[in-house]
Amino acid sequence: MISPLFFASEGGFGLNLDLFDANIVNLAIVIFGLYKFLPPFVGGILERRRVAILADLKDAEERLLKATEALAHAKKDLAAAHQKAEQIREDCKLRAEAIRLDSEKRTVEEMARVKQGATADLNAEASRASAQLRREAARMAIENALSALPGKLNADAQAQLVSQSIKNLGEA
């Protein structure tokens, strides 16, 4: 059996079996304890969390600043690379144009040289053919004259004509 010391009605320290009164007293004790002891504990946790969040924000801002600077530097480098590429492209165009003009000039000069050479060869061949035709015509004329003259000329006139023909052939 339960000893009478546990009951409050007996006048000693005991258990209060009235649940509503007991719960109100217990809630008052718990609320007072939470009010007294919880703020420093929860405040410390919240303060540490606030410091961590501020540190994370500061770190994120620093990384954003570095990334922004890196992006600006990369954009500047890209612009410089585009400018250099454009300069190289322009230089190549100018060089290609100079090479093309030089090639055209050399081609025209070579064509003129070949034309002069062909003209000189043609003139030389024409001169040679003309000289050969003159010699052949002179030879044939002399042969015809010599074959026709023996009956028409005397020996002195014939000798003089042969000498003059030989002299003319030597000059030609």
Curated annotation (Swiss-Prot):
Gene Ontology annotations for the cellular component aspect, listed alphabetically: plasma membrane-derived thylakoid membrane; proton-transporting ATP synthase complex
Protein name: ATP synthase subunit b
Quaternary structure annotation from Swiss-Prot or TrEMBL: F-type ATPases have 2 components, F(1) - the catalytic core - and F(0) - the membrane proton channel. F(1) has five subunits: alpha(3), beta(3), gamma(1), delta(1), epsilon(1). F(0) has four main subunits: a(1), b(1), b'(1) and c(10-14). The alpha and beta chains form an alternating ring which encloses part of the gamma chain. F(1) is attached to F(0) by a central stalk formed by the gamma and epsilon chains, while a peripheral stalk is formed by the delta, b and b' chains.
Gene from which this protein is expressed: atpF
Signal peptide: none
Pfam families: ATP-synt_B (PF00430)
Chain's role: F(1)F(0) ATP synthase produces ATP from ADP in the presence of a proton or sodium gradient. F-type ATPases consist of two structural domains, F(1) containing the extramembraneous catalytic core and F(0) containing the membrane proton channel, linked together by a central stalk and a peripheral stalk. During catalysis, ATP synthesis in the catalytic domain of F(1) is coupled via a rotary mechanism of the central stalk subunits to proton translocation. Component of the F(0) channel, it forms part of the peripheral stalk, linking F(1) to F(0).
Family: Belongs to the ATPase B chain family.
Membrane topology: Single-pass membrane protein
